[in-house]
Amino acid sequence: MLALQHASKSFGPVRALSDVSLELYSGEAHALLGENGAGKSTLVKILSGVHRADGGELWVDGQLRVFHSPAEARDAGIAIIYQEPTLFPDLTVAENVLMGRQPLRRGRIDRRAMLTHVGRILQELGVPLDPARPVRGLSIADQQLVEIAKALSFQARVLIMDEPTAALTGQETERLFRVVRTLRARGAAVLLITHRLEEAFAECQRFTIMRDGRWVSSGPAAAYTIDSVVRGMVGRDVRELYPKLPVTPGEVALEVRGLSRRGVFRDVSFVVRRGEIVGLAGLVGAGRSEVARSIFGIDPRDAGEVRVQGRTIPAGNTQAAMRAGIGLVPEDRRQQGLVMDLSIERNATLTVLNRLRRGWLMDRTAETQTASDWTSRLRLKAHRLTDPVSTLSGGNQQKVVLAKWLATGPAVLIVDEPTRGVDVGAKAEVHRTLAELAAGGLAVVMISSDLPEVLGMADRILVMREGALVGELSRQDASEEAVMYLATGQQPAIGSVA
């Protein structure tokens, strides 16, 4: 259906693509895999008409094509669904889907025909959305489905999806992929760009791997393993993804006893010792993030006690939690962990600004030194610390969030989905950082929906189900099957809760 052959693209002296080829077939989902900077975005922009290749050929349905604009690519049946939907929030679903192409009757928009047409598209996709509803207020997941309906209204047969599940829950992700399977069954070709390798293996029939702007390999998904994909993407073995260092746990740093919040979680008890990484696993909605937020004092609790190094922390008091030595790296770093318009330097010191003041004035030298110290330790890749934090990659943004909390000198660090939305190479760096911090005596609580991450990094794994802590697994006894049995209730709890 689509073939890109030996494509190259440069921007000034920078070679973004060099001799890259890609083939998409009707009825197949094809994963495009590579680290940030591998050239995936440039390739997609060539396919979608944003950029023209300097060399190579693009064939669509057996015809040689040269796109001068996104409109030409769209007319050829190629559509792209971005991670952040680009819809008009104050218009309805139907108006967004048919923007600029609304059916007319006697010179005026025929709203009944518009709603009927869009309703039919949504029904074909199995999407229960009201076409008359305004887009404002829809979840990101629903907005992406509106974008897919819009693509189908253009008779798109090639759908490019750029990190579509990065901001979705597990249930939303499954619903999205049900729609993708429907599209494939109708003969569409889907190009999926994702950092989530488990999604690629579950949903895609073919893979293409890129590294440093070059094609590495292509082939059937069945011919690859996680190890071979990672090696192709980063040139390193998969074992380097989880560089866990051996530690001997020390004294208890965090003690949680009988933590409860009505309707959310109940009677949660566990301890974490210095030097340990304790994983908190479970299905979406099990209450893991809510427990973390309650420990840190963001959310209230009805009962229970939190102690840090023997000191009781009052409920609902984040300042007390910070003073006691707790740090929390939140699940959504862009919305909750960073101020995107501020500099890297200021974001890295937000938690310690009071220490960096001289009277009423900020000691800029001390601020710069503090930010520089921690970002250097975390091997941050940035041009200047005065640049906006929004200019960084996802992995480097996560390092800034870590720097912000490490600057407080915590005894306990809670990290919620620490590698969500970052590429494989950045994952390895975040994992190495957590392992080094634990080896230095920090107590780490790691909440993650990425089971290989939990299994690879945790000394112990606590599993939650429906707001309750249902079991504990040692590193030696843990497996994906054992965790999922506990998380789903398919088997009696294994192990004991501390």
Curated annotation (Swiss-Prot):
Per the UniProt record, which EC number(s) apply here? Answer: 7.5.2.7
For the ABC transporter domain, which residue ranges apply?
Answer: 2-237, 247-491
Superkingdom field:
Bacteria
Q: Which UniProt keywords apply?
A: ATP-binding, Cell membrane, Membrane, Nucleotide-binding, Plasmid, Repeat, Sugar transport, Translocase, Transport
Q: Which reaction does it catalyse?
A: D-ribose(out) + ATP + H2O = D-ribose(in) + ADP + phosphate + H(+)
CC per GO annotation: plasma membrane
- State one molecular function term (GO): ATP hydrolysis activity
Q: Where are the transmembrane segments?
A: none
Spell out the SMART domains in the cross-references: AAA (SM00382)
- Positions contributing to ATP binding: G34, E35, N36, G37, A38, G39, K40, S41
Q: Which PROSITE patterns match?
A: ABC_TRANSPORTER_1, ABC_TRANSPORTER_2, RBSA
- Quaternary structure? The complex is composed of an ATP-binding protein (RbsA), two transmembrane proteins (RbsC) and a solute-binding protein (RbsB).
As for family, the record states:
Belongs to the ABC transporter superfamily. Ribose importer (TC 3.A.1.2.1) family.
Return the protein name: Ribose import ATP-binding protein RbsA
Record the organism. Answer: Deinococcus geothermalis (strain DSM 11300 / CIP 105573 / AG-3a)
Q: Top-down, what is the taxonomic lineage of the species of origin? A: Bacteria, Thermotogati, Deinococcota, Deinococci, Deinococcales
